[in-house]
Amino acid sequence: MAILSDKWIRDKALNEGMIEPFVENQRRDGCISYGLSSYGYDARVAPEFKIFTNVDSAVVDPKDFASNSFVDRETDVCVIPPNSFALARTVEYFRVPRDVLVICLGKSTYARCGIIVNVTPLEPGWEGHVTLEFSNTTPLPAKIYANEGACQFLFLQGNEPCEVSYADRAGKYMGQRGVTLPRL
């Protein structure tokens, strides 16, 4: 499995719509960096957040998730309460080629502040906005900045296309738009 370069990412984004909108050069002046890097793409977080709250003393159940456990906010700066988390999404819409698996890693700028970004791999054939989970591991409120870098996607090419892609098996998160809660 090979990690794919900026040249490959640029070509797929510009000619096949793999990443839309696509920022060709890494932006970093006065903001958390985003855009094309040497062997990856730093995606931005959209100004659409679901901030976890437990006012109803709910039990978190991935099989029966209570959507009222979140407060919806559209804002340029999201404040996550101490030891809590928020869901968000990428500005970018991704279309993953059939022979590629995409891994996401958090930005060190956030990690150094105790803010962890979690995303499961983007499977071959999947497309959509990526739902991001920001965990505030600190005992203090933490800020997330919309329209700035949130995480880096690394593109890994398999030795051959998979037999059954995410699209082939009609995965439950196929084509998701906006922040998407757990589905069964």
UniProtKB/Swiss-Prot annotation:
Matches recorded under InterPro entries: dCTP_deaminase, dUTPase-like_sf, dUTPase_trimeric
GO BP, one annotated term: dUTP biosynthetic process
CDD domains recorded: trimeric_dUTPase
Reactions that this protein is recorded to catalyse: dCTP + H2O + H(+) = dUTP + NH4(+)
Molecular function (Gene Ontology), one example: nucleotide binding
Pfam families in the record: DCD
EC number: 3.5.4.13
Record function comment: Catalyzes the deamination of dCTP to dUTP.
Subunit composition and interactions: Homotrimer.
UniProt name for this protein: dCTP deaminase
Native species: Novosphingobium aromaticivorans (strain ATCC 700278 / DSM 12444 / CCUG 56034 / CIP 105152 / NBRC 16084 / F199)
